[in-house]
Amino acid sequence: MASLLTLENIHKTFEAGTVNENHVLKGLDLEVEEGDFIYVIGGNGAGKSTLMNILAGNLSVDEGDLLLAGKSIKNLSVRKRAKDIARVFQYPKMGIASRLTIEENMAIALRRGQKRGLGWGVKEKDRIQFQEALKELNIGLENRLKVDTQYLSGGQRQALTLVMAALVKPKLLLLDEHTAALDPKTSQMVMDLTQKIVEHHQWTTLMITHDMNHAIEYGNRLIMLYQGKIVVDVKGEEKKHLTVEDLMHLFQKNSGQSLVSDELVLG
């Protein structure tokens, strides 16, 4: 299968030339195939958030290139990338305007990447599309389009942002620890919805998580970052049978360092 996303020799340094210089990504290479659902794990400072911000366009690269569907995107702004790359953030209130209704938020998401102007209101054909998309969640939001999102629970907001992110059928979906701020029961609910929706639509997805059990249970591929490089990359049948112990062994074998599971949970 052809690569949808290619990262070539990505370097990123913060505060270069100072005593606080931090070389976060060190020649990172990654090939992502269309339809991959990749979990990205690693301890604090491994480069996970930096990688997400580079993909979304919030950070530029110092060296290297990013190719999406064969075209370089490294010089594109966040707005220009937004049509092809959608992102769901860690905190339920991010990515949603809490004083706007569900349908108003979805209308904004539907026009992501477009210039603001006339025709940004909610149309009847939009409502039909929104209801169809929300039905997939099976949590009743399709009947609450005119409810302000400030009255939704954290889990409902994250489920909504997941649907909003995918309204324009992005080439790439970025999930930035989108269950981390939820209680365990709600986190599991959102994860189950995520797996169901991503698999149904075959969206190419990268998700950051600190939960090794989620990383092992969900998705078709798992990569682990350490000191700015990918040290573990597991997919296919190997991923299906992977255990936490296997993962820790692979990390030690490839990095030369020992790892305890708490380092990822706390990282």
What does each model-found stretch correspond to?
Residues 18, 72-86, 94, 116-117, ...:
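ABC ATPase NBD coupling module
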Residues 209-210:
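H-loop/switch region of ABC-family ATPase nucleotide-binding domains
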Residues 64-72, 234:
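Conserved ABC transporter NBD signature motif
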Residues 2-4, 13-27, 77:
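A short, flexible loop at the N-terminus of ABC-type nucleotide-binding domains that lies
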Residues 56:
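Helix-to-loop junction immediately C-terminal to a conserved catalytic motif
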Residues 41-43:
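The feature captures the beta-strand-to-loop junction immediately N-terminal to the Walker
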Residues 229-253:
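Conserved beta-strand-loop-alpha-helix hinge in the C-terminal portion
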